[in-house]
Amino acid sequence: MTPLPSHPNPDANEFAGKRVLVTGGTKGIGEAIAARFRSGGATVITCARTAPGEVRSGELFIEADLSTASGVEIVATTVLSKFGGVDILVHNVGGSASPGGGFAALSDADWEFAFNWNFHSAVRLDRALIPSMLEQGHGAIIHISSIQRRLPLYEATLPYAAAKAALTNYSKGLSNEVGPKGIRVNTVSPGFIKTSAADGLIDRIAKDAGIDRESALQGLMQSLGGIPLGRPGQAEEVAELVAFLASNRAPSMHGGEYVIDGGTIRTV
């Protein structure tokens, strides 16, 4: 198993003066992304369906459900009125809430919610905030997709996987349109990342199967076909990739999908 990495101290001024919006930025990968931009000197705005226990200093939190059009409107209106727009937009909100049981267990409501949460939220917010980016002549947009868009798990997360596939495809088309106008668009597709939600899933698997936690973890990794690196990724690793793509260190990185999965996807 590859040892856990040590994360370098970022340049405290790398994102100074930048306005950054991270959706779903209070837990897991989103929380790590927000923290990474804050450590680089950015003004960070986050939004989620429920307010965190403590809003960090220098950070604006907007309580809104981005799976709804009205929730997107709340976020966009607040950001535009208070900040005049953003320089960096990271769409991280999303997840799976579908029941197990395969395709036959999925209702229209399950499919609609998955697409509203994982796909339409990004499309709607882009539509609301890109005009201000076009007006200022620059911007960076990063959509957080998933390797499930290429490696769908049909038992319980098929709607999520399909919505992420749509998000990745949409991102490519958007990049072709807005790239010539100064806005870079990229997609980051994580694999199995260690978060509090992932830890909870491992605990549930261990309890339901009557096995120890390590066996549950190994079983979960094997359900993905194994992770050649030998461990789940860390949220901070995803955050570092996002920060790099959004920074001036990556001026020609545009219209791409960047997979961070420890080698889970074995094909080129």
PLM segments and residue spans:
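Catalytic loop of short-chain dehydrogenase/reductase
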Residues: 142-166, 171-180, 192-193
